[in-house]
C-alpha cells in the first residue's frame, strides 16, 4: 500500500427523507454491489418498522442506538523491540461513526429474522436499549483496551 498520498475525504450528501448525512452513511454501509436504491428501501422500511414498534421518532431511536454503540477506545497493534503490543488508543470522531455504522450493519446481517429491514430495525431497537450484538462488540473492545492499559505509554 502506497504511503505517498492520503485519500481525500469526500463529502456525503444528506439523504432525501431525513435530510441527515448519517442516514446516507448507513445506506452506504448497507449497500451491496452498488445497489443504492435497494439499500435505501431497506433503511427506510427499517425506520418504518422502528416507528411502528416503538411509537417514537425513528431517527431519534437510531441516533440513540449510534450513541450507545460508538466506541471511545480501540486497540492498535504496535511492534516495539521485536514484540507486538496491543496499545489502547482514542478513536477519532470520524472513525467512531464509521465503526458504529459498520458494527450495526454487520450484526444486523448476522441476525435470524427473515428480511434485512426487519433485522436492521431490531438491531437498532436493541442498540437503543443497550442490548444486541453491536453493543457487545463495543463492550468487548473497551474491555480489551482496559486490559491492555499498561501499554498506553506506547501510544504514538
UniProtKB/Swiss-Prot annotation:
Q: Which domain of life is it from?
A: Bacteria
GO BP term, example: translation
Keywords tagged on the record: Ribonucleoprotein, Ribosomal protein, RNA-binding, rRNA-binding, tRNA-binding
Q: Which GO CC annotations does the UniProt entry carry?
A: small ribosomal subunit
Cross-referenced SUPFAM superfamilies, in alphabetical order? Answer: Ribosomal protein S7
Return any one Pfam family short name: Ribosomal_S7
**Entry's InterPro entries?**
Ribosomal_uS7, Ribosomal_uS7_bac/org-type, Ribosomal_uS7_dom, Ribosomal_uS7_dom_sf
* Keyword RNA-binding assigned: yes
The answer to keyword Glycoprotein applying to this record is: no
Care to name a GO molecular-function term for this sequence? tRNA binding
Per the entry, what this protein does is:
One of the primary rRNA binding proteins, it binds directly to 16S rRNA where it nucleates assembly of the head domain of the 30S subunit. Is located at the subunit interface close to the decoding center, probably blocks exit of the E-site tRNA.
* HAMAP family given in the database record: Ribosomal_uS7_B
User: Which PANTHER family does the entry mention?
Assistant: RIBOSOMAL PROTEIN S7 (PTHR11205)
Known partners and oligomeric status: Part of the 30S ribosomal subunit. Contacts proteins S9 and S11.
Entry similarity comment: Belongs to the universal ribosomal protein uS7 family.
Q: What is this protein called?
A: Small ribosomal subunit protein uS7
Query: What is the native source organism of this protein?
Result: Mycoplasmopsis pulmonis (strain UAB CTIP)
Gene encoding the protein: rpsG
Amino acid at each position: 500500500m502506497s504511503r505517498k498520498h492520503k485519500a481525500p475525504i469526500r463529502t456525503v450528501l444528506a439523504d432525501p427523507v431525513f435530510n441527515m448525512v448519517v442516514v446516507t452513511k448507513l445506506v452506504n454501509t448497507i449497500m451491496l454491489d452498488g445497489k443504492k436504491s435497494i439499500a435505501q428501501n431497506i433503511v427506510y422500511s427499517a425506520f418504518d418498522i422502528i416507528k411502528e414498534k416503538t411509537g417514537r421518532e425513528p431517527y431519534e431511536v437510531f441516533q440513540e442506538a449510534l450513541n450507545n454503540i460508538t466506541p471511545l477506545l480501540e486497540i492498535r497493534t504496535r511492534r516495539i523491540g521485536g514484540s507486538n503490543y496491543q496499545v489502547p488508543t482514542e478513536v477519532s470522531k470520524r472513525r467512531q461513526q464509521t465503526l458504529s455504522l459498520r458494527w450495526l450493519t454487520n450484526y444486523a446481517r448476522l441476525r435470524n429474522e427473515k428480511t434485512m429491514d426487519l433485522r436492521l430495525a431490531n438491531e437498532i431497537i436493541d442498540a437503543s436499549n443497550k442490548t444486541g450484538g453491536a453493543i457487545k462488540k463495543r463492550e468487548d473492545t473497551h474491555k480489551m483496551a482496559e486490559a491492555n492499559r499498561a501499554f498506553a505509554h506506547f501510544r504514538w
